[in-house]
Amino acid sequence: MKDLKDLVRPNVWNLKPYSSARDEFHGDASVFLDANENPWNMPYNRYPDPLQWKLKDRLAVLKGVDRSSIFLGNGSDEAIDLVIRAFCEPGLDSVVTISPSYGMYEVAANVNNVECRKVSLDENFDLDAEAVLESADEWTKVIFLCSPNNPSGNSLDRGSIYKILKNYEGIVVIDEAYIDFSAYPSFLKELSGFPNLIVLQTLSKAWGAAGIRLGMAFASPEIIGVLNKIKYPYNVNQLTQEKALELLNDEATMKHQVNEILTERNRLEKILSEPPFSYQVYPSDANFLLVNVAKADAMYNGLVKKGIVVRNRSNVQKCRGCLRITIGTPKENDSLLNAMKNMKL
């Protein structure tokens, strides 16, 4: 890895971050007259903890990392945007992504006027490490890898990921939004060995908390320090912090629901790949299946008319004819299967 100072934008490296009232005070107090808040207990009259320490303490235990290696944001999308803003000079630097994959990497790059170079996965949605490395040049600051990948659902080859980590001198972001559904381990344990690694996770999938918008970035304390420098002061609100802590203290419920989803995923994969459907169902390590139904537009519109919404991915590279189907409850999945079975295309 290059020296971090050589990767971070010079203006960001030299930036004196905004210091909030809650940043400047450390200790216990009963009277707070420092932040121009309403003094009456509403009960959310006070600004939230800008660095979310209680939440990070719980995550540190769950994830086996030091709290100084945790960044929390308003969904993982905030972390994606901050990584690009921290490392990429607009109009000069570039990022590399794989295709097809999660679309926000490209959107965030475009918003920040940063070139986004896309490297195609093969027909089985496997990663070509050499092609990714060849796509990067001296102006490439970040490589984004989503594993398990969205919309394909498969985990990327770990050997290929290691090859990129070992041979690329910039930042490598591994988006693990779906890792709780995967049979493969997280890359969190690799943080100490790869100072250029950032791992993204979320509460939106396995933890069932998409509505509270909490994303996590794990990296070296030095990288986390850079992200904290440019984030908005109170980027995670008090309600989100409280609900997230409540959820994280009930890991048993999450694991039970994940097991139910995996059972249903296997059931749907088997049914949809056999007669009378006989669709091509791609292997999945996520909470969804990518299914080639051939007449995707007609199937999608037919399901919508029956009140069932899936994601039509037919216009995405290498996904022609494909629907992405989120695994629902057994009742929801049965409704889907019955609707598809009786569909006249």
Curated annotation (Swiss-Prot):
Tagged with keyword Membrane: no
Alphabetized InterPro entries for the sequence: Aminotrans_II_pyridoxalP_BS, Aminotransferase_I/II_large, HisP_aminotrans, PyrdxlP-dep_Trfase, PyrdxlP-dep_Trfase_major, PyrdxlP-dep_Trfase_small
N6-(pyridoxal phosphate)lysine: modified positions: 205
EC number: 2.6.1.9
Protein's UniProt keywords contain Acyltransferase: no
EC top class named in words: transferase
GO molecular function: histidinol-phosphate transaminase activity; pyridoxal phosphate binding
Reaction(s) this enzyme catalyzes, per UniProt: L-histidinol phosphate + 2-oxoglutarate = 3-(imidazol-4-yl)-2-oxopropyl phosphate + L-glutamate
Needed co-factor(s): pyridoxal 5'-phosphate
Keywords attached to this entry: Amino-acid biosynthesis, Aminotransferase, Histidine biosynthesis, Pyridoxal phosphate, Transferase
GO biological process: L-histidine biosynthetic process
Associated pathway: Amino-acid biosynthesis; L-histidine biosynthesis; L-histidine from 5-phospho-alpha-D-ribose 1-diphosphate: step 7/9
PROSITE patterns referenced in this protein's UniProt entry, alphabetically: AA_TRANSFER_CLASS_2 (PS00599)
Family: Belongs to the class-II pyridoxal-phosphate-dependent aminotransferase family. Histidinol-phosphate aminotransferase subfamily.
Complex formation: Homodimer.
Record's protein name: Histidinol-phosphate aminotransferase
Naturally occurring in which organism (per UniProt): Parabacteroides distasonis (strain ATCC 8503 / DSM 20701 / CIP 104284 / JCM 5825 / NCTC 11152)
Gene responsible for this protein: hisC
